[in-house]
Structures are given as C-alpha cells and as structure tokens.
C-alpha cells in the first residue's frame, strides 16, 4: 500500500453515462481492516463490496454488485443493470410479489447467484411486518423467486455470515390489562400481542424481557436459499436502541434514564450456524455516541461510553469478558468533550472527540484488565467517521468547522501510537446540506489497495491519497438528486459507477481530475 501511495496516479477520463430508465416491470416467478473488495479467481474480477462494521459479517444495503451486474433499490422495486462490458447496458426491473401496494423495499444482499430482498409491510390490522424474499439470479435478468419469510415488526437491520442471514425488526408488545390477562393468555388470543414469525407466535421461552418496556427486537435466522425454513427465532424486550454484531455474538444496547443518570444496558446473545443463545447482561454509565464505539475482539467486549449532564461531558472505556463481567476500565477521558468517531483495530482504539479542542486519541487495549491512554493530538475540525487505511494510518472523514459548511479529510500517522501526527488534511467547500457518509458508514467507499476514497454530498467526490501529495480529487460526479441518501460508489476493475436513486453515473479510473 505504501508503495502504491507513492506512485503517480493516472488521469481520470470521465466517460459520462447516466442510466435512469429500464425495461418493463417483470413479474417474479414462483418456484475490517475492512477491504471493500472481492477478487474472483474464476474470472479475475476485482469489485467493491459494502463497507461493513465487522470483517466477515456482511450487511444489506440499497446498492450491491457481483462484478457483473448492479442491483439497486429504486421506488419500491429492484433495478438490475448489466455491467459485464464496463458501460451500463441492459437493465431489468424486478417488483417483488408484494402483499400490498404500500410495501417498500428496504435493502438487499447479492451473493453466489442469490438475491435476498428485505421489505416492510403494513398488514390488515395496521401492524408492521418485515417480509424477506429470496431469488435465484443464475440469470440476473430473469430472477426466480425461491422463498419468502415474514416476521412482526418494522425492519431495523440485518447481518449475513456465510449463507445464514439474521434479520432484526423492531416491535412492541401491548401487554393486556390486568382484568383481561387470563383471557389474553388463552392460546387462541396470544397472537394478538405476542410477536410472530411466519405466522407462528414466538415460543415463550424464546422471549427475554430486560426491563419494564413494551418495545423490543424480533430476530430470526435462516439460510438465504430457503428463508421459509426458519432456523431460530428470538425476541428481546430491551427498548431496541441498536445492535452490534460480531462474528459469533450479538450485543443489544439501549439507554435509559434512572434517577437522572444515563444508563446503557448491554445484552449478549451468542450464535452458531443460525442457532441463538442468550447470555449475560451488563450496564455502563452514559451512552454510545458512535456505532463504532462498541467492539468485540479476542473474547472481550470494549465499550466507549459518553456521559453528559448540564455541567459537562466525560468519557470512559470499559472492557468486559465473555460473561459480561467488567475486567478493566479507563475513566475520565476528555472531560468536556463528546466522542464523535471511534475505530478499534489490533491492540488499539482510535477515537475523536468534539466540543472545545477536538483531539484525536489513541488507547492501548492490549491488556483487557488495564486499558491505557497512549497518545493525544489536538486538531482543527473533527471527524465523524474513522477508517483504517493501513498498518500505520487512520483516515478521518468529517467537517472542517463547527457550522459543517466544509468537509475535511484527514490522514493520521499512527506509526508511533504515543505520538500521533496529522500527516495530511484536505478541507473543501460544498453546496450540499447533507452528507450521508457522516451518519451511515455504508455510504463510504474506502479501498486502500486501489487508492480510492469516495462519498456523496452535493456531488460524488472521489479521492486518491499520496503521503507526499496528500488527497487528490479524482472525480466529482454530478448527481441527478443532490443531497439525497442512497448513492454508492462502486468499482469493477478500472470501471467506476455512482449508483443510487434510479441513476448510474459511469467513468473510467484512468487518472486524477485535471
């Protein structure tokens, strides 16, 4: 990577192709260091994948590619565009066999000849359901429906490990009044208030109630090739703030106020090949202000929490073992500051705080019983997202000013963890009012091996990086729907695509923008 950074970058030749139309709708047939790339040995295709939290744990998104086609969520359907020859070509529209016209496609997976679609549905009783469809895409322009599944609740997120998908939906249990509890517990009435998966109520021994709450998460697991055959189902009633998924466990966390103190409860659920098993719970003072502020490595869970009140803010780093017992803690970090971005890798955690001095921190987590703060660097501006660039560099994407009117890219040199250095920075103006990359890591493309950094604001900005020259703009592709969510940068070999909201911009990766 270092040698690649020192090479002069080739010129980008912008060959503008915008795809917004397509063929007629087709009725379906019944019947981390994270590198965002896949190299197919069979056909030597090098193409990007979704930016994910955990290496080895795939995540659904609104745009996917298998190196031959681009699959994009578009107005309640999926558009499938042929990119075999580079330039976007033949396109097909797939509209799932919805339960009702108001159903919406949320996200999808594409792997090994299979397309898995997640949708939201409002049933006849006015309750939310998550419905998943699985398609055989051996011929991507003629997808064949092979199975479906449903579960109560509004779709929240999902994860895929191998061929097993875990789907999470937010639900609420309307507990019956005391005077009618006996009637409600009648098996004939249970389906009125107990969540269901594929029309079957969840077994009582698979429902876990953490506290006095009526909201929680339904989790189901199944093979992508046969979603109708549910492997396992669980429901955890914990307030459903968010979930972090490692390679072998889920950690559900939710914040609550108790006696004017912020408490975040974290509950562990282990899994193997789709079978889920509940574990222990713990709690920390404060809340998690960044999705990457929680991480599991080597059997330990690390949590970077922020506590704030009317007077000040303070942060702390907690370490828990497999039984969720605290083994170590680092208190009193950056008083008066809020954690805005974090990233765990190897024996270190890197994080940015923001409010007054906006420092970049490095903490050593080699010893789970004794985490230590190693280095601190005060910088202007602040990062909302951190990404590991290589063994000695961390990329930051954020804002150059408190008004968020400028975007700032930063490359931190962490070769000496005790003395981090801002190696290069780039601050640029933009005409947008929203940058999805700041709130959704899946909207970011970072590929050190191809020297690409991309994200959308008012345009799609694509940069390269050289330690001597800094960040260099490769392209700023215009977007039909400026400031919209859902645009993704995708590459296949030397072809680059900006796909989202029904359009595809295409250009060749042949050099920096002149």
Please tell me what each predicted stretch does.
Residues 1-514:
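Beta-sheet-rich non-transmembrane sensory/scaffold domains
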């Amino acid at each position: 990577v270092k040698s690649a950074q020192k090479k002069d970058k080739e010129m980008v030749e912008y060959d503008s192709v915008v795809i917004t139309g397509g063929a007629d709708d087709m009725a379906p047939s019944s019947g981390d260091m994270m590198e965002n790339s896949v190299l197919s040995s069979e056909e030597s295709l090098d193409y990007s994948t979704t930016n994910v939290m955990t290496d080895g744990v795939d995540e659904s998104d609104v745009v996917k590619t298998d190196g031959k086609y681009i699959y994009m969520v578009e107005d309640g359907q999926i558009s499938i565009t042929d990119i075999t020859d580079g330039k976007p070509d033949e396109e097909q529209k797939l509209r799932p066999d919805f339960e009702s016209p108001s159903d919406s496609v949320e996200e999808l997976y594409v792997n090994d000849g299979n397309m898995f679609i997640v949708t939201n549905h409002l049933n006849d009783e006015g309750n939310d359901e998550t419905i998943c469809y699985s398609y055989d895409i051996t011929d991507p322009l003629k997808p064949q429906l092979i199975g479906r599944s449903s579960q109560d609740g509004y779709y929240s997120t999902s994860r895929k490990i191998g061929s097993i998908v875990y789907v999470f939906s937010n639900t609420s249990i309307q507990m019956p009044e005391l005077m009618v509890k006996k009637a409600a517990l009648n098996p004939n009435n249970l389906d009125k208030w107990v969540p269901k998966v594929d029309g079957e109520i969840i077994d009582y021994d698979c429902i876990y109630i953490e506290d006095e709450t009526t909201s929680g998460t339904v989790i189901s697991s199944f093979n992508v090739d046969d979603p109708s055959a549910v492997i396992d189902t669980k429901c955890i009633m914990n307030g459903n703030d968010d979930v972090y998924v490692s390679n072998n466990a889920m950690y559900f966390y939710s914040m609550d106020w108790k006696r004017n103190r912020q408490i975040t409860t974290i509950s562990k659920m282990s899994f193997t090949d789709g079978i889920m098993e509940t574990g222990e719970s713990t709690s920390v003072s404060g809340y998690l202000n960044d999705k990457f502020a929680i991480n599991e490595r080597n059997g330990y869970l690390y949590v970077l929490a922020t506590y704030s009140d009317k007077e000040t803010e303070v942060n702390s780093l907690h370490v828990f073992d497999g039984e969720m017992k605290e083994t170590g803690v680092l208190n009193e970090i950056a008083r008066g500051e809020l954690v805005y971005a974090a990233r765990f890798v190897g024996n270190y955690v890197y994080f940015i705080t923001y409010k007054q001095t906006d420092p970049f921190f490095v903490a050593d987590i080699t010893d789970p019983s004794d985490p230590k703060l190693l280095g601190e660097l005060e910088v202007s501006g602040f990062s909302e997202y951190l990404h590991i660039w290589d063994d000695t560099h961390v990329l930051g994407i954020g804002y150059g000013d408190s008004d968020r009117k400028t975007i700032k890219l930063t490359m931190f040199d962490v070769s000496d963890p005790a003395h981090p250095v801002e190696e290069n920075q780039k601050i640029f103006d933009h005409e947008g009012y929203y940058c999805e990359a700041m709130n959704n890591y899946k909207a970011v493309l970072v590929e050190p091996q191809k020297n690409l950094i991309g994200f959308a604001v008012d345009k799609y900005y694509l940069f390269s990086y050289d330690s001597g020259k800094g960040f260099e703009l490769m392209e700023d592709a215009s977007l039909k729907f400026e400031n919209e969510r859902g645009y993704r940068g995708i590459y296949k070999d030397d072809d680059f695509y900006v796909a989202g909201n029904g359009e595809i911009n295409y250009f060749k990766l042949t050099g920096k923008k002149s």
